[in-house]
């Protein structure tokens, strides 16, 4: 079985059946494409540890550590899947996966978010930034939202694993939403649309919009739509929010995933201790 066919089989029999996210599917396809480009579409039975070692070295030239790790991990998952159905391939336990370097999420203060919103060059930009921060939703979830879906400052999204999740917005977000929608003259059902063709905005367009707003606000951090999700979570805990409630709001399947935000708050406590404790 060719490498490309092996990844395809994994997608069809595992990802789609398990209702995995589009992000998981995209990562699988990117890993397959990159591996085939490097090794050629050889039989996966002939894939060796040396192939993987050389591929990993090649990835490190122009990919981030997280991307390298993600690609190697995805290959290991696919081979593990084949191994379990008695396919003649490399033992997945022999494939070394680079360790994830521990890092705290980048987040913005409430003041920085407010500066970003005010730096938005139109009401659509202000609404998008405000919505991402107020609700903590993912970029992919924002793109799928439709007009009329937010009622009484509440709405439901379908998150990872096709699970519905209740989300909320604040009055500031509602204000910018109403301003933006009042300007719209198109018939698109999408909540946010491109000014050029009035179709649903793409992830790339929104990422660029957020990055430019951060630059105009004078923020030096690397800001993405996901940074606003991190900011929502961090500031929720800083205001003594309950970790389990936060996990539900974020749509995390495990409380362990949400717990990474407690480390940011722990850092706050340590800084306060160092600043105010005197011997």
What residues fall within each predicted segment?
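Conserved catalytic core of the tyrosine transesterase superfamily
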Residues: 1-279
